[in-house]
Regions:
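Helicase-associated low-complexity/disordered flanking segments
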Residues: 1-92, 171
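Walker A/P-loop NTP-binding motif
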Residues: 95-103, 115-134
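Short hydrophobic/aromatic beta-strand immediately N-terminal to the Walker A/P-loop
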Residues: 103-106, 140-141
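Conserved Walker A/P-loop ATP-binding site and its immediately adjacent core
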Residues: 115, 136-159, 180, 201-205
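Conserved SF1/SF2 helicase motif Ia
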Residues: 123-152, 165-169, 222
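Conserved RecA-like helicase motor-core motifs
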Residues: 163-179
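Conserved motor-coupling elements within RecA-like helicase/translocase cores
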Residues: 179-196
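SF2 helicase catalytic motif II
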Residues: 201-205, 210-233
Length: 233
């Protein structure tokens, strides 16, 4: 698309539309209004924005081949048969997480910040399950709003669902945000998910309300390996 041609076409169309409502006979009034149109007083200037091109990094298959990621993780993070290629900041985040270091990711919208933590979390879970360790809540992700938690849950479940991994190795993701029924809360307490998505208000309630279900959910996170604050700002 030719952006400047489109901008000119859009404004011209809008000008014709706005002029079509009246026919001005007075020459001096028409001249004054024409001057306002010519000065662009009825629409804002074009807003130009440059989208950065993020530095490219290895593919998920590259990290599997180097031993940095489990083969099962390589099956999760793909688009069909095509392996996911990481940006450099994503690969650096994966390396930080594998080293056990805390880190903060600050990068642009649409740059794949969620993969910076989901990839090492999923990899840690798959390795633990492959080693025969019992399921326990190894990661808690705290979101500022339920809508974000809901969309992220759909996204990671889509990746896991298309992986073809056996159920014994598939990470289980559950949501504990206050939207769940009592029955669902009971199931989460009785069968700890590998990844628990919550919001900051529910996270506080888990630590302070301490009814029997909440206490069990917290107990299920004994040995927690990841706590992630999304949209920290």
């Amino acid at each position: 698309m030719r952006a400047f041609e489109f901008d000119h076409h859009l404004i011209s169309s809008y000008e014709r539309f706005s002029r079509s409502f009246s026919s001005i006979r007075s020459e001096d009034l028409r001249a004054a209004i024409d001057a306002q149109y010519d000065a662009g007083r009825f629409w804002p200037d074009a807003l130009l924005s440059l989208n950065p091109r993020y530095l490219s990094g290895p593919t998920v298959d590259d990290l599997v081949a180097s031993g940095d990621l489990d083969e099962g993780t390589g099956r999760v993070f793909r688009f069909g048969e095509k392996p996911l290629r990481f940006h450099r900041h994503q690969a650096e985040s994966i390396a930080k997480a594998k080293s056990g270091k805390s880190f903060v990711v600050t990068t642009g919208t649409g740059s794949g910040k969620s993969l910076c933590f989901f990839v090492p979390v999923v990899d840690t879970i798959i390795r633990a399950l492959r080693a025969g360790k019992p399921r326990t809540t190894r990661a808690i992700i705290v979101y500022p709003m339920n809508a974000l938690a809901n969309s992220q849950m759909k996204e990671i479940e889509k990746f896991i669902g298309q992986s073809g991994l056996p159920d014994a190795l598939k990470p289980v993701v559950k949501r504990y945000t206050g939207q769940e029924s009592q029955e669902e809360r009971q199931r989460i307490a009785a069968n700890p998910p590998d990844i628990l998505l919550t919001n900051y208000m529910m996270a506080e309630l888990l630590l302070t309300r301490q009814d029997d279900l909440d206490a069990q959910v917290v107990k299920n996170a004994t040995g927690l390996e990841f706590i992630i604050l999304d949209e920290l700002h």
